[in-house]
Structures are given as structure tokens and as C-alpha cells.
Swiss-Prot record:
This is Truncated thymidylate kinase. Pfam families: Thymidylate_kin. PANTHER family: THYMIDYLATE KINASE. Transmembrane segments: none annotated. The gene is TMK. One of its GO terms (molecular function) is dTMP kinase activity. InterPro entries: P-loop_NTPase, Thymidylate_kin-like_dom. Coiled coil: none annotated.
Length: 208
């Protein structure tokens, strides 16, 4: 089993580095501009994720589309969701500990206590709309090794229960026909198909 771990924002890209500067408050940007930047940043990795899935990798992504939605909704902003994949399985680390607000001079953007509570509630609302067999809530206070084993066990179960990859479901309910994806010219746009009575895909690769 091969897997790749990604996280957003990624400081190794120009867009990701700019996002970190905004979060650290060294660069000013409106909320709408920032969320558009986050959306652009996720889209930048579309081809990489598609290629990895084509090559039978499991792709584990920290802070992907659900995070984008939860944070944008906290600012009352609707974001573009095309060119993102719908997670096949989601792990949500939840804590019942009171949020501790950092001193203002070292706070990053979004780290105010009130804002964090709104974002947390947004996550709960989003998770309520995710099918129960496609997500797992993990208490964040558990030992890291226990969390790792939970993630590994659940991931292997999903992996073992699925068969060969043909389509990757995208967030807007379109499908990427990964079977026809050519890794040489990689013109993935022509592989996007509408959901016209297409059966739910089965795959042995998934975004967590």
C-alpha cells in the first residue's frame, strides 16, 4: 500500500507561502481575497492528486475542501468548489477542551476564540451532511499512536472493501474518468464527465 500525505496551505508554493504571510498578519488581504487564494491553492494540486490516484496511491490530505468551506462560512463567504475531489473518507479530530485564546500579539488569523468556535460549529454542520460510513470522529486528546492506529485501521478497511479505480468523484458531483487519463499529456479537462445515471464508483484509492 502506497500513500502520500499533503497538507494545506503548502508553504513550498508561491500561493501557499503568500497564504502563510496573510495568516501571520505580515501581509494584509480582504477575507474574500484570502478565501479565493485558498481555493486557487487547492486547485493547484488537482493534477498531482489525480496522477497519484491513477498510480494507485492513497492520498491523505490535511485541511482540504471541508476546511475551506468551514473557514469561508465563518466569514460569510461562498467559495468555488470545482477542481476539488470529494473525500472518500474523512477523519475529524474533535476536542471538548475549552479553546485557549493566544495573546493578541502572537495570534494568527482565525485564532480568535469566538472565530474558532464558529469554525468548529461549521465543521459539525458539514460532518452532519457526510454519510455516516464516510467519516470518523476521533477524540483529539487520545495518544498520537492510538490516533494513528485508528486512521490506519479505517483506511485499510476502506481500501480493502473497494475494487479497481475507474472514476474519481469530484465535489461538484462530476467525475474524473481516471481510466482514460493520459499521464503524458495529462489533459485532464477532457476526462471530466457529468453524473448521468453513473453508478457510484468503487476504487482502491481514496482521498482521506
Amino acid at each position: 500500500m502506497l500513500y502520500i500525505y499533503m497538507h494545506f496551505p503548502n508553504p513550498d508554493t508561491v500561493t501557499g507561502n503568500l497564504i502563510f504571510q496573510v495568516l501571520d498578519k505580515t501581509v494584509e488581504m480582504s477575507s474574500e481575497q484570502l478565501h479565493k487564494l485558498f481555493t486557487k491553492h487547492r486547485s493547484e494540486f488537482f493534477t498531482e492528486i489525480a496522477a497519484l490516484l491513477k498510480l494507485n496511491f492513497i492520498v491523505i490530505v490535511d485541511r482540504y475542501i471541508w476546511s475551506g468551506l468551514a473557514y469561508a462560512q465563518a466569514d460569510g463567504i461562498t467559495i468555488e468548489t470545482k477542481d476539488t475531489f470529494k473525500p472518500d473518507y474523512t477523519f475529524f479530530l474533535s476536542s471538548n477542551k475549552p479553546l485557549k485564546e493566544k495573546p493578541f500579539n502572537i495570534q494568527r488569523l482565525f485564532e480568535e476564540k469566538d472565530k474558532q468556535e464558529i469554525i468548529f460549529n461549521n465543521f459539525i454542520t458539514i460532518m452532519n451532511d457526510v454519510p455516516k460510513n464516510k467519516f470518523c470522529i476521533i477524540p483529539a486528546h487520545l495518544n498520537k499512536e492510538i490516533i494513528y492506529n485508528i486512521v490506519l485501521t479505517k483506511t485499510l478497511k476502506v481500501f480493502d472493501n473497494n475494487s479497481c479505480l475507474k472514476y474519481i468523484k469530484m465535489y461538484d458531483d462530476k467525475y474524473l474518468n481516471v481510466q482514460d487519463l493520459n499521464l503524458i499529456d495529462f489533459d485532464w479537462q477532457k476526462c471530466i464527465e457529468d453524473n448521468n445515471d453513473k453508478e457510484e464508483y468503487d476504487d482502491n484509492n481514496f482521498i482521506v
